[in-house]
Amino acid sequence: MASAVFRLLQQGPRRLLAPAVPTLAPPVRGVKKGFRAAFRFQKELERWRLLRCPPPPVRRSEKPNWDYHAEVQAFGSRLQETFSLDLLKTAFINSCYIKSEEAKRQSLGIEKEAALLNLKDNQELFEQGLSFSHRCLTQFLEDEFPDLPAEGTESLVSFLTGEAVVCHVARNLAVEQLTLSAEFPVPLPVLRQTFFAVIGALLQSSGPERAALFIRDFLITQMTGKELFEMWTVVNPMGLLVEELKKRNISAPESRLTRQSGSTTALPLYFVGLYCDRKLIAEGPGETVLVAEEEAARVALRKLYGFTENRRPWDYSKPKESPKRAEQTSVAS
């Protein structure tokens, strides 16, 4: 004890009056891992919040790095089609956009005459494109399915030119991002009108042949994997089958129960076959005998119309141009 006091006295009074140096604690190894876990948890919370309450969609033109003129030019190159730039820009302008922009100008105090925009909407191009698409699709379907009646052809054309199919194609071709509309997301009728206006612009720019190939490549392909009666609603398939057989001088079909399983259970299954002149022409399943009979009639109609599941695939190779066909198409357009 005395020796320790002696050493302190030797170091001088400064050592005695010096403040004590705090001892640093060793670093805790789990601090960084805790920060990482908290950061991951915060990111997961943010992801779930976006999934439950997604932000409203924003126009592409409201985001950075957007050049409308360059995007319109790139649209034709992306589809490998030649468009007149003025016609293509007109195809993307809808009347609702012009009205909304004029209303915004008037709300800012601009006079009505000065607020008018020197723009032309796509109504004329839409009518041309829709009319040409109807004629072209009808011709394609009549050539591919010659036994299909006119009612069936019209139903298929209506399906291919309906809002669901056309808007699906238009969105995948980025037509929605270039469409000038008062609302966003673009309403389905406006998007459908814009797509057919683009076809009308292509018809005037490159001619009927390129427009027909465009329709074949982007609308006819939507029939892939579709069953005939998904696109054509037939209320009474048995009555239609009787009419078709009568046109072909074939006797009326007779239905016979060919197989059944689980008739006393909750999930029964029946197979009904249709016979003409003692020959089985079709067979269909169903949970009741009536449903199975209707399905057998649909199977027979598919065979008559050449719309079976094992039919020859659609030929998408470049068609050989027929002078007579080309002349008819050009005259029709």
Curated annotation (Swiss-Prot):
Q: What is its EC number?
A: 3.1.26.-
* Start and end residues of each DRBM domain: 236-306
Q: Name one GO cellular component term.
A: plasma membrane
Location(s), subcellular: Mitochondrion
The record places the transit peptide at: 1-30
Q: Which UniProt keywords apply?
A: Endonuclease, Hydrolase, Mitochondrion, Nuclease, Ribonucleoprotein, Ribosomal protein, RNA-binding, Transit peptide
Region of interest (Disordered), ranges:
311-333
Q: Which family does it belong to?
A: Belongs to the ribonuclease III family. Mitochondrion-specific ribosomal protein mL44 subfamily.
Record's protein name:
Large ribosomal subunit protein mL44
